[in-house]
Amino acid sequence: MSITVERKKALISEYADLENNTGSVEVQCAILTERIINLTQHCKINFKDFHSKRGLLMLVSSRRKLLSYLKKKDLNRYTQLINRLGLRK
């Protein structure tokens, strides 16, 4: 199941530093994390759906690239985002 418009707006308002800053790394990572969670649940039920598994790997890869960019640019924002999203460490 994909993310609803209301859920996406809630994520944007929660993680954006400005009112409608949808392009910030924090917002993009939050939306990707939500999509990854939904797709993980789908892949657990439909374990032979290899196209969705590939899509899941692509989403994880793009989130990893965004997080590594943020880690290089601003370590404090990176650690705050990791803690808020509940990712590693």
Curated annotation (Swiss-Prot):
NCBIfam families: S15_bact
Subunit description: Part of the 30S ribosomal subunit. Forms a bridge to the 50S subunit in the 70S ribosome, contacting the 23S rRNA.
Recorded family membership: Belongs to the universal ribosomal protein uS15 family.
Name under which the protein is recorded: Small ribosomal subunit protein uS15
Any GO CC annotation of this UniProt entry: cytosolic small ribosomal subunit
Pfam family, one: Ribosomal_S15
Biological process according to GO: translation
Gene name, Swiss-Prot/TrEMBL: rpsO
CDD domains in UniProt: S15_NS1_EPRS_RNA-bind (cd00677)
